Amino acid sequence: PEYRTLRSRRTVHGGGGIQPDVRVESDTTRVSGYMTRMVAQGVYNDFLMEYMDRYRTLLDERYPTYEAFAEGFTLSDDDLGLLIRAAKERKVEYNEEDWTLSKELIRTQLTAMIAQRLFSTTEFYRVMNPRENEPYKKALEILHAWNEQGEQILLGQ
């Protein structure tokens, strides 16, 4: 069967599943073995439980809204040092090269998880999507430029 899209009146063909107009590959180049081992051994959870136990009252006072959190919260290098210590306690061997590769991705993930614990799951994605989700960023780019460039965006991919 053939269908026409509502907005651009493009013809799309049914019968076999959904094929995206634009393919965007996820960037996994910053996911290191060290990071993967930390996640697998529960280090993120250990860190987050300790961090939230220690700082929840301060965080609640300082960031009463997600907007205040997004504007002012930064997970410091000292905070990340606590993560490395938690990894050592879980027998996850430190790897400097892997840490350098994954450090900022880890910082973003932990920031998103802290936002989730303070507010809701929605805020996890409000942190992660604009920073780390390539398909999300590409979709926003296409939608924001749609009126000016329309179908050319899709045809040019």
Regions found by a protein language model. Give the residues of each.
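Conserved functional hotspot residues or short segments at active or partner-binding sites
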Residues: 1-157
